[in-house]
Amino acid sequence: MKTMRKITAIIRREKLEDVKDALELMGIHGMTVSDVKGRGQQMGIRESYRGMDYCVDLLPKVQLEIVVDSEDLERTVEAISENARTGDVGDGKIFVTDVIDVVRIRTGEHGRDAI
């Protein structure tokens, strides 16, 4: 069984379509996308509402989860990074973890065949 990796990318909402398009051009169609909130170096933003100042310290982001074969890892991470980057604080993070197995529930397929 080939080694698989899970890529978890936290990116700006407005960059999601660019990242999805780049991944689809590479033949990567399967992904899970979730709305998340978080903070890092950006530390939130100040907003004014009806004359009152508020600090929003958990900012909305999008989380993508993608499982790929190890040989596709570098180019996939590169595509996400290039297409999610604005150059500003708050562009996000990419995490890579090992995947022991994947099982397609409908068919019982394992490993690469289940991705």
UniProtKB/Swiss-Prot annotation:
SUPFAM superfamilies: GlnB-like (SSF54913). One of its GO terms (cellular component) is cytosol. Keywords: Nitrogen fixation, Nucleotide-binding, Phosphoprotein, Transcription, Transcription regulation. Pfam families: P-II. InterPro entries: N-reg_PII, N-reg_PII-like_a/b, N-reg_PII/ATP_PRibTrfase_C, N-reg_PII_CS. It comes from the Archaea. GO terms for molecular function: ATP binding; enzyme regulator activity. GO terms for biological process: nitrogen fixation; regulation of nitrogen utilization. The modification O-UMP-tyrosine is found at residue 54. Could be involved in the regulation of nitrogen fixation. Belongs to the P(II) protein family. PANTHER family: NITROGEN REGULATORY PROTEIN P-II (PTHR30115), NITROGEN REGULATORY PROTEIN P-II HOMOLOG (PTHR30115:SF11). This is Nitrogen regulatory protein P-II 1.
